[in-house]
């Protein structure tokens, strides 16, 4: 474009130089030129920042041959429009980079990367300002028109918007989310005021899907609803919950700001997971068209960091709401599938966090799906093992040995009158450990729980050293097996220590 005509490349060695002489920089040189230009823009405006989203930035690099960084402006009136749709319009439609001031507020200026000679800068800037003005006029119009309609009225229109072919409308989904939000608030023992805020936010959270702004700028769903909620007079907790309820949208994304937002986000995601499983379309292999894995990970992150509750009963309730809607499925079977799905995500996340595989397996074996409990137990067991490797290695071996020969059908009611000293010592240690473990679990003191388990190492070692479990006397043999069942039972609510004895 800047170097018309033919340009002969005599050899591979001169290829890039010929391109440069013809007005075409290499990709790396284009990147450097744009970054240098942006740095100059920021240096001339102390405290300001040019927003360059990676995807758009890479597109710009590949759309120009000889980049020139210029700065344009738009009218002050457009700053009254939510900055999210202003920026999306500039970035998506024109690939202009917005400039923010030192306080993080959008300014009237934006960066244009032009593919023309610097001497044409004034004309290029004028043309781009006219283009952006037209785009922002549209965004302003959509926003102002939306403000004329209440979110409740928008919500009524959701009856004509399908959520999923077999699962009904988005209006029906919003009704389920509202009920789930109240159930989550109860499960988390939150106050009536916060529960009411969560329910109100859930009631309105999908309303903006039919607004003009979101129809035009689909990635701003939720965000625009938050603005409209504020304009309607909803309190900040409700407005922010509507704004944030799609979070986290991807790995590393922020969690919702407020508690109500966390509740609505979990309710929305859980409703989707429950519904898709209910119609028999769960993720398979690499196929996950409804992004259920991402939704489950989002729920897990929220429950782990912000709402330390067990989702088990909530899964049942989410499925119950679909059943009441007339969706037919085996509730018990699907509930188990959803629990297993969450469990699988927990295990995957733990491994991604480099928690030892056998530690994860030990905690996973007791089928905990409360994220805060699962990760706390993994951390406590891992720390206990590091602090006393020999004790836990030996305890794991003894547990695995006991599990190998045990007969669960015999129960755990043993007869002390048939026991020798080693057996009595193990019986006493098991009962003491059970009491200590129960108290520790009630207090969510997982290090104390694993310390109580570790205290059984010496008694179980002595038992296997001194006692012939499989005695010829059936009465003695069964009593000893019952004692081993009792020993195993102490572990049943916290971790399967035998997993630590498996070869890696």
What does each model-found stretch correspond to?
Residues 1-504:
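Amphipathic alpha-helical "coupling" segments that flank catalytic cores
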């Amino acid at each position: 474009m800047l170097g018309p005509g033919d340009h002969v490349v005599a050899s591979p060695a001169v290829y890039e130089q010929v391109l440069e002489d013809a007005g075409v920089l290499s990709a790396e040189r284009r990147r450097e030129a744009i970054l240098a230009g942006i740095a100059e823009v920021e240096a001339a405006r102390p405290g300001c920042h040019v927003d360059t989203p990676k995807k758009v930035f890479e597109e710009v690099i590949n759309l120009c041959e000889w980049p020139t960084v210029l700065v344009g402006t738009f009218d002050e009136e457009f700053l009254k429009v939510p900055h999210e749709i202003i920026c999306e319009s500039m970035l998506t439609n024109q690939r202009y980079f917005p400039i923010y001031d030192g306080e993080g507020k959008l300014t009237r200026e934006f960066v244009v990367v032009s593919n023309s000679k610097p001497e044409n800068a004034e004309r290029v800037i004028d043309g781009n300002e006219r283009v952006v003005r037209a785009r922002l006029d549209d965004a302003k119009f959509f926003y102002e028109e939306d403000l004329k309609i209440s979110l409740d009225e928008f919500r009524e229109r959701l009856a004509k918007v399908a959520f999923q072919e077999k699962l009904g409308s988005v209006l029906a989904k919003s009704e389920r989310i509202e009920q789930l939000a109240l159930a989550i608030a109860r499960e988390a023992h939150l106050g009536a005021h916060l529960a009411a805020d969560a329910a109100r936010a859930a009631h309105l959270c999908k309303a903006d899907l039919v607004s003009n702004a979101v129809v035009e700028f689909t990635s701003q769903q939720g965000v625009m609803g938050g603005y409209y909620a504020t304009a309607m007079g909803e309190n900040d907790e409700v407005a922010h919950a509507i704004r944030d309820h799609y979070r986290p949208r991807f790995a590393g994304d922020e969690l919702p700001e407020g508690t109500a937002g966390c509740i609505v986000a979990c309710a929305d995601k859980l409703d989707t997971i429950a519904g898709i499983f209910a119609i028999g379309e769960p993720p398979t292999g690499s196929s996950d068209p409804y992004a259920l894995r991402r939704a489950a990970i989002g729920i897990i992150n929220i429950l782990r960091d912000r709402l330390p509750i067990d989702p088990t009963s909530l899964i049942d309730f989410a499925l119950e709401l679909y059943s009441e809607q007339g969706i037919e499925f085996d509730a018990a079977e699907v509930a188990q599938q959803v629990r297993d799905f969450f469990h699988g995500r927990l295990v995957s996340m733990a491994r991604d966090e480099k928690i030892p595989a056998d530690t994860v397996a030990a905690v996973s074996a007791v089928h905990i799906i409360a994220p805060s409990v699962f990760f706390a137990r993994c951390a406590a067991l891992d720390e206990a093992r590091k602090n006393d490797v020999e004790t836990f290695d030996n305890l794991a071996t003894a547990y695995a040995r006991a599990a190998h020969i045990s007969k669960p059908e015999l129960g755990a009611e043993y007869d002390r009158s048939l026991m020798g000293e080693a057996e009595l010592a193990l019986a006493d240690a098991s009962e003491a450990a059970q009491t200590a473990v129960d108290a520790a679990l009630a207090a969510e003191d997982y290090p104390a729980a694993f310390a109580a388990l570790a205290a059984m190492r010496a008694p179980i070692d002595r038992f296997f050293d001194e006692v012939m479990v499989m005695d010829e006397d059936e009465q003695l043999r069964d009593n000893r097996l019952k004692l081993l069942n009792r020993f195993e039972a102490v572990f049943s609510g916290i971790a399967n220590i035998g997993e630590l004895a498996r070869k890696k």
